[in-house]
Amino acid sequence: MPIAKMKPVIWTIAINVLLMTSSTLAAEKSAVRFELHTNHIVINVGEQAFATYVFASDKITRPFFAHVHAPNAVQVTRNHPPQPDDSQDHATMHPGIWMAFGDISGHDFWRLKAPVVHHHFVVKPTTQPSGGTFTVENHYLATNSRQTVCVETCRYDILVRPTGYLLICSSKFTSNHDFYFGDQEEMGMAMRVATPLAVVNGGRILNSKAQRNGKEVWGKQADWADYSGTKEGTYVGMTLMADPNNFRHSWFHARDYGFIAANPFGVNAFTGGEKSKIHVKAGKSLRIRFGVLVHSNAKDKINHAANYRDFLNQLK
C-alpha cells in the first residue's frame, strides 16, 4: 500500500517539472531582448529579430525603427537603405517606422532640415514579463541647431501579443518657452512597408471604416489603418493605430507606393479647412500616442477590430 500511494506523487512531480519546463521555454521564446550599441538598439523576441531602433545617424537626423520583422520572421518594412529591387523614393525620409513633424514652430523635422537629437535614456532598455520597454529624451533643435525648439520624452513598449508584436509609442512634448505644431500632411506617426506589400505590387490598405487603398483612405479620419500583403509566400503587415485620447482624431496620409501615416494635425492639409496651429505654452505639454501591430496571420484570420480593442486595453 505505501508503494501504491507514492506513485501518484511521483507522477505529479514529473508532470509539474514538465509544465514548468514548457512554461519556461515558452517564456524564453517570447522574451523581448535588447542589445544596446553606440547609436542603436537591436531588439529581438527570443532568438528572432524584431527591429533595430536607431537613435543617432549621420544621414537621418531623427530616431526611427528599421528592419522590422513579423512573428514569422518576414521583414515588413522596406530595406534600409533601399536595395536595388526596392522602390527608391524617399530613401532617407522613409526608413521604417518613425514619428516626425514637418512643422514645429516653423522648423521641418520630417524632411530632415532640422535635427532631432537623442539626449539620453530616461529608462534604459528593460525586459518585462509582457515584453520590453525603454524611454528616451529627444531634443528638437532649430534648423541652425543652435536653439532647442522643444523636448520630447518618448516611451516605447514592445509587447508580445497573441496577434503579433505590438509597438506602442507614447510621447510628451514640452519646453520652457511657447511653441506650436503646424498643419501639414507630413506630421505624426508613419511607416514604410516592404516593397512587395505596397498596393502597387498587390498589397492592400484597409481602415476602420472599410475604406481601401490610397484613393479611399487618404485624408479620412479613422481609428486604424492596416497595410498588408504577401511576401515570401505568407501574408504579413502592420496596423497603425491612434489613441482615441489624443487631442484630435487622426487623419491618414496613405500612398499606394507603400507609405502611411496617422496625423491629428492636418486640418487644412486633409480637409481644406482653416489652417490650424496647436499651441503649447511654456511649461505645459502635449501628449500623443500611437501603436503599430506587426502581424503574420492569414488574411482571413485577422480581426482588426479585436486587435484595436487589444491595443486600447494595453494603454497605461
Residue ranges and their predicted role:
Residues 1-7:
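N-terminal secretory signal peptides that target proteins for export/translocation
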